[in-house]
């Protein structure tokens, strides 16, 4: 993991500088996850948690599957699939109204990805940068796991 961090970190910071330079000073730690989802699994349209300054996904296996789908809004307007290609990466810096996305299996193969995020614990500062209500965000982040658990949706 240390080698992976050493390899990826500098590039990820450069991407964050390009996409959201005001967030660079908020960086505190990196988060890596190797994720395998089933061939029939679908995660609902959502925006990432506010503590993610930069979100990245690297498609590992199989050769072909369904890539990440980006939308204009939570309702799924104007879907744009980032084509799955082994070792392709997608990075973005979440914003409150512009980073709606989801992912799903292709009904043939499980999906294996490496997720790499630049993180902060200073969510209040992120809210200030984005001009959003901190208390609303805290409430949403508290309730979303329950909404997803029972309704397979996010708020």
Predicted features along the sequence, with ranges:
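Active-site rim elements
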Residues: 1-7, 42-43, 102-104
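Substrate-binding/active-site groove segments that recognize
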Residues: 56
């Amino acid at each position: 993991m240390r080698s992976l961090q050493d390899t990826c970190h500098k590039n990820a910071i450069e991407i964050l500088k390009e996409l959201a330079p005001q967030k660079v000073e908020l960086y505190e730690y990196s988060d890596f996850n190797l994720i395998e989802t089933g061939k029939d699994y679908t995660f609902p349209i959502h925006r990432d948690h506010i503590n993610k300054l930069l979100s990245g996904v690297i498609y590992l296996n199989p050769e072909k599957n369904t890539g990440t789908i980006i939308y204009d809004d939570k309702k799924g307007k104007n879907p744009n699939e980032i084509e799955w290609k082994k070792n392709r990466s997608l990075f973005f810096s979440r914003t409150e109204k512009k980073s709606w996305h989801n992912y799903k299996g292709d009904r043939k193969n499980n999906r294996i990805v490496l997720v790499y995020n630049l993180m902060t614990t200073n969510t209040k500062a992120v809210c200030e940068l984005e001009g959003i209500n901190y208390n609303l965000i805290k409430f949403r982040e508290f309730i979303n796991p329950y909404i997803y658990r029972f309704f397979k949706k996010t708020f």
